[in-house]
């Protein structure tokens, strides 16, 4: 089952490596990971998406709490929360599909952020399901040259 962990940790050298090492040592895969400083520059917020049963995730949480750099671990996927991901993709364009690509991007509330004579670079934010649906549809209208995704960021509501 998909799980999203939000980890507050010290913004220090080696902190990221220790968290990733813990997952690696236990044989757990990290599906996505994001990390950035918080409003307090001494702290960072890490969001990890992984897959595991409740017992495995509980064990990971216990092990994370033992790391000296980790201040708080919250499983945000089980409560009411907001999650987003950003995708940038470069698509091949031709004259008879330009309007279709623009229209699909607008329907998904995305943006065209760069235009050349042969390509568009599109930007879209939303849930993973929304981004997956967009990619599936856009493939019907254009060749996707390159895709880069940010990974999930999330926050609990309330």
Swiss-Prot record:
Residue ranges constituting the ACT domain according to the UniProt record: 4-78
Keywords associated with the record: Amino-acid biosynthesis, Branched-chain amino acid biosynthesis, Transferase
EC number annotated for this UniProt entry: 2.2.1.6
UniProt-listed GO biological process terms: isoleucine biosynthetic process; L-valine biosynthetic process
CDD domains recorded: ACT_AHAS
Single GO molecular function: acetolactate synthase activity
Superkingdom classification of source: Bacteria
Record's GO cellular component terms: cytosol
UniProt keyword Endoplasmic reticulum present: no
Designated name of the protein: Acetolactate synthase small subunit
Organism: Buchnera aphidicola subsp. Acyrthosiphon pisum (strain APS)
Organism lineage string: Bacteria, Pseudomonadati, Pseudomonadota, Gammaproteobacteria, Enterobacterales
Gene name linked to the record: ilvH
């Amino acid at each position: 089952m998909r799980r999203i962990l939000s980890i507050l940790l010290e913004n220090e050298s080696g902190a990221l490596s220790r968290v990733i090492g813990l997952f690696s040592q236990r044989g757990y895969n990290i599906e996505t990971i994001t990390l950035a400083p918080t409003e307090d520059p001494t702290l960072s917020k890490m969001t990890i998406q992984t897959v595991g049963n409740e017992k495995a995730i509980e064990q990971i949480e216990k092990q994370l709490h033992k790391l000296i750099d980790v201040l708080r671990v919250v499983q945000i996927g089980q409560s009411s929360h907001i999650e987003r991901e950003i995708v940038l993709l470069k698509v091949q364009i031709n004259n008879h599909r330009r309007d279709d690509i623009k229209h699909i991007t607008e329907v998904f509330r995305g943006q065209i952020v760069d235009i050349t004579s042969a390509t568009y670079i599109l930007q879209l934010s939303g849930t993973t399901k929304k981004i997956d649906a967009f990619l599936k549809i856009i493939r019907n209208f254009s060749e996707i040259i390159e895709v880069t995704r940010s990974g999930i960021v999330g926050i609990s509501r309330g």
